Regions:
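A compositional/structural signature for long, glycine/proline-rich flexible linkers
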Residues: 21-487
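Gram-negative bacterial Sec-dependent N-terminal signal peptides
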Residues: 1-22
Length: 487
């Protein structure tokens, strides 16, 4: 009897063992994001966790919320116009152009430049493709920077690429229509949100101001339904001024409002698809946003984290040492600009400090708040910036040195001068072939006035742009000159 019982128990054990081994010994490894478990909606997240994820979301989403808010504002214009008499605005699908350098009182974007004639237009490509019209610019440097919602450029369109005059079609990620006859090429955006900023070189002379007007009139965008294969033009010299003039002392228009951020991030998560590898971030951020909708206390913690992050992490990006990488002599240089990918540090830093950069091969940026000894630049001191002979920025296009006030904007001065460079045909070189530029609040004297950048009182920063740089610009082997305090 005992033997039979033992046999039965052994058989049962073996049977149970066989059943246990019917499942794979190794659990299959997930190979796609959909095979992973996602955050659980019902969990009760503590304040510390909510704020940690909220801070990450604020840093990550800042550039895209910035973009969508700019689009919402700019496209309220009923026709191409100048907001406050100085910033191009236009209805959705169209652009507006300046006909001269941007006015110094503008606050739409930090670090404006007075090297080019700007334009601006925003698009909603899930509604209809847009035709981008390119006139014949001759030998003049030009580039149309076309950005997606992430502020990455999505087109190679300009003089550096040998782009032809004509018509280009900008389409959304899901567009499957037919390309009309007469279109030079198709630009596919990665997001429905896109914008274009044409930049057209103009020398600081009466003659070139006149010469640039003809091509500028033909810089246009319009819905595909209006395309007829004929070059159109627009009289930008006589467009109306709408809206109130900005207050430069207040700094750049605040495009990201912390206590509205998470409402707007919800739209971003729905409108902008994840980049490869971003799926987990989207899952975490959606989980957070949904929790904030369900629980007012969670939303309060999210808003508190947004406010704090804006005052600390985001504010720190306004210091040039926290942008890009060291370039020598106290300068930093931009890195991955306008092709950020998952470089969130530089993407968010640029969005805060100098939105809408060009790609490095189009423009390389060098910037600093400090002199050669590491001391903060201040308008109460006089400085010299000397380029040794043969060491001007090596470019195929042109270069400039621009001065900004503490808000990364222009401050009015007696010469109405905010930058010096290739555009200035009256710069005076030293007998040894070097070029010295003077940065000071007071004039350095009549003989040096052509090389003078007037500085406001208070802290300042300097900014070099190298358009269409040579290899030494691209690989970082060219080093910006020292900024030396005059004793």
């Amino acid at each position: 009897m005992k033997l039979k019982k033992l046999v039965w128990l052994t058989a049962f054990a073996l049977s149970a063992g066989a059943m246990a081994q019917s499942a794979p010994l190794t659990i299959p490894h997930p190979t796609t994001f959909d095979q992973l478990n996602h955050p659980v909606a019902e969990v009760q997240m503590p304040e510390s966790y909510v704020k940690a994820i909220a801070q990450q979301a604020y840093i990550w989403g800042y550039p895209m919320v910035n973009q969508f808010n700019r689009r919402a504002t700019i496209t309220q214009a009923p026709e191409p116009a100048l907001n406050g008499g100085m910033v191009p605005v236009a209805p959705m699908g169209q652009l507006s152009m300046l006909t001269d350098y941007i006015k110094p009182a503008e606050t739409f974007v930090t670090c404006p430049n007075q090297d080019v004639v700007y334009g601006l237009g925003f698009f909603e490509l899930d509604k209809e493709p847009v035709v981008i019209q390119v006139p014949d610019f001759g030998d003049r440097f030009w580039v149309y920077a076309v950005y997606d919602a992430r502020t990455d450029q999505i087109a190679n369109l300009g003089k550096p690429y040998g782009s032809k005059p004509g018509f280009y079609l900008l389409v959304g990620p899901n567009w499957q229509g037919e390309t009309p006859k007469g279109i030079e090429g198709v630009i596919r955006s990665s997001t429905e949100m896109a914008n274009v900023i044409p930049r057209v070189q103009m020398d600081d002379t009466k003659e070139d101001r006149l010469a640039v007007q003809a091509p500028v009139r033909e810089v246009m965008t319009y819905p595909l339904s209006q395309f007829d294969g004929k070059m159109k033009s627009y009289d930008y010299a006589n467009i109306p001024s709408i809206g109130e003039k900005p207050n430069p002392s207040a700094g750049e228009t605040k495009w990201v409002i912390p206590n509205k951020f998470f409402d707007q991030l919800d739209n971003v998560l729905n409108k902008v698809s994840p980049l490869p590898g971003e799926e987990a971030l989207y899952a975490h951020f959606r989980h957070l946003v949904n929790a904030g909708k369900q629980d007012p206390k969670v939303r309060q913690w999210m808003d508190e984290a947004a406010e704090q992050t804006d005052k600390t992490v985001i504010a720190d990006f306004f210091k040039w040492k926290n942008n890009g990488v060291p370039a020598g002599n106290g300068w930093n240089r931009s890195k991955n600009n306008a092709e950020f990918g998952v470089d969130y540090f530089n993407r968010t830093g640029t969005s805060k400090s100098n939105m809408f950069d060009n790609k490095p091969n189009e423009t390389q940026y060098f910037y600093t708040d400090n002199d050669a000894t590491g001391v903060q630049l201040d308008g109460k001191h006089d400085y010299t910036v000397t380029f040794p002979k043969g060491q001007l920025p090596p470019v195929k296009g042109f270069w400039s040195l621009t001065l900004y006030n503490s808000k990364h904007l222009f401050s009015p001065n007696e010469l109405n001068r905010y930058s010096l460079g290739t555009k200035n045909k009256d710069l005076k070189f030293n007998p040894d072939g070097s070029l010295t530029l003077y940065v000071s609040h007071k004039s350095p004297g009549k003989e040096k006035i052509n090389n003078w950048l007037p500085a406001p009182e208070g802290t300042i920063s300097l900014y070099i742009r190298a358009y269409w740089g040579e290899q030494a610009i691209l690989d970082g082997s060219w080093v910006p000159p020292k900024i030396e305090k005059v004793k």
